[in-house]
Amino acid sequence: MFRVKILVFFLFLGVASFATNNSPFWGQTGHRVVGEIAYNHLTKKAKKNLEKLLKGEGLAIVSTYADEIKSDKAYRKFSAWHYVNFKDGEAYETGEKNPKGDLIQGIKECQKIISNPASSEKDKVFYLKLLVHLIGDLHQPLHTGRAEDRGGNAIKVNWFRGKTNLHAVWDSKMIESYNMTYTELSTNLDYFSKNQKAAIQKGTIIDWANESRELALTVYGSAKINDNLSYRYMYDHFSTVKSQLKKGGLRLAKVLNELFG
């Protein structure tokens, strides 16, 4: 009986590990890396104001909140804020807008509510948590992908022989395969010269969206339906993932410093 209990225990650990490593949530790790890098580049004033508003919760921890509430029907109206679609060769400014909102509209609405002195503390906290997440989404190229394939979700591929889709490969699979915690990865990525930081933080939300869109077109050309992706794909593309995480963190810091610093 004792041996049976031990076997059941280790089977449970295996299932739990599998579930963790196949997280649907950039995955949780990616968003937390963006939040952690951003926190490291806040001004003293912004850091103090944010810590007071979030009551000690770190940006890395709140970065996944917008995904955690997705299953709650009360928050379904925010679903369209996680992505933005515009046609190939078309700039966001001139394209047709989603009447339900989109990633760029969502970011701007968060900024508006947070900066409004009349907004309640509860609303500021809620929209701040969304903002932290949405800036991360903006830097995952396929969150600016094509509507017809739902940002690569409809492009079925294999990742190390496991069935998945192209969106998930860029959201979480490559990051999880790198096998670092968010603190390890953020520490590994958080190095910039003064000039590099200034160059990355230059521009507007729309500029950054158009930049991600250009990357998305490259991502679409990187794989076909039913492709078997593994080490070579990781070698060719993980540098882009790391670059986008770094950009997301520094740009989130810029946005938050403007709001709170």
Regions found by a protein language model. Name each.
Residues 142-143:
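Transmembrane alpha-helix/helix-exit interface in multi-pass inner-membrane proteins
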Residues 20-132, 146-261:
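N-terminal, motif-rich segments that launch catalysis or mediate targeting to/interaction with membranes
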Residues 1-28, 261:
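Bacterial Sec-dependent N-terminal signal peptides
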